[in-house]
Amino acid sequence: MKKHMLALFLACSMLCTLGACGQQEESSAVGEGNSSLTDSADDSAADSRPADSAAPDNSSKGEESTGRNEQNPESAADTSGSGTDSAAEPSGNTGKPSSGGNDAPGSQGNTSDSGQHTASTTAPRQEQTPSVTTVQAETTPASEIKTITLLGDSVRFEGTGIAARGSRVGITKGGTYRISGSLSDGQIEINTEKKVVLQFDGMSITNSAGSAINVINAKRVTVELMPGTVNSLEDGNVQHDADRGALFTNDTLVIGGSGTLNVKSNYAHGIISDDDIIVNGGTIRIVSTNRGLFANDDISINGGTLFCDAGTNGIKCKNTISINGGTSILMGGTREEKGAIIVLGGLTVNGGTLYAIGNTCTLPLASSTQNILAFNFTSALPANTLTRIASGSNPLFTFTSPRAYKTVICSGTGLKDGASYTVSTGGSVTGGSNTDYVITGGSYSGGTDRGTYKSTGRISSFTVS
């Protein structure tokens, strides 16, 4: 019995000893593990501090990079010519309700043929026009104006950011440039990320092989027509896809001042912008084999006189057109799908005087704030046929066209709701004046009465048989 008890005691002692050793080994293992982690952390803190501190910096940089990427549209707008107030919202869509979100421009392009969403997108764009006008009105101190004098087949200039080779001029810096003289076969090319102001001070450029002015890049280009001056631009009749117009710009174009600009396009468009076109003043006369005025984004006409005599479309725009002031005389071609005004995103007329004459024309939206008369003749009127629209004995619109036309849209402050208007075609005017096919004054006789039509509201559209 004692032997058995002794054996049991020895076995228990061995088990206890083994258990204690196992606990000590396990405890030692955990301790080493903790010690290892702690040492590793300490070593990292002491020996690898730059690496640890770099991690938050990398994370921070990543966040900053993301932030910059989110703002890239605004940055792009600032350097591509969309920094004007009229173009800033679509390019900087960062959740602003007025911009319609990033999908707005795309959806407009996709639905432009059906005309959907145009009323909701036109109004915000119009609200931005006054701010653009204010920016355009800023003046440059005389000491900061650079001069470019065109000397037929050479150029003389004063100021930085200008380079010249023969009759070719390059502008590579922002600023204000006053241009005078003439080039018989040359070009001004602009390539900068800054704003550029071109003061046309009695200048003329003809380029037989391309555009007269070619803006590759600029934040915004403003053309100031100096008081009392007559200026002209003309392109060649050879193919020049890269330029596509007598005056071509990749970015927003603002035209103002009180002088005159005559544009003749022998190959394609008169004035074209891949961004917006804003007309604030001056007298602009465009004669073009293709479109007179063309913009990929918006066109705003706020003042001045714009005359377009175009082989296809008087003015065309892929987004919206708003006519808010001035006098616009727009004449389109005779092909079925061509007209005085063609716009994919919607046309609004809120002021000024409008003559739109062509084979067809986009009808203004109901959101327009000025009364509009639209007449569609069942048979085209021959070229040079006079049309007269009168209220009683008071002539309101009298005009002709160098080409046959079927559609006429007119607007002016004299139109009233519920008033009646008489349309006459043919005949002649004695003693009046004819400017850009619009006739004022004189005595009208010999025309054919085509009927009297009563205004039915803001936009009145009639068929004339």
Task: Give, region by region, the residue ranges found by the protein language model.
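Bacterial N-terminal signal peptides that target proteins for export
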Residues: 1-8
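Secretory targeting signatures
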Residues: 2, 19-20
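A composition-driven surface/loop motif
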Residues: 8-15, 21-43, 47-55, 60-74, ...
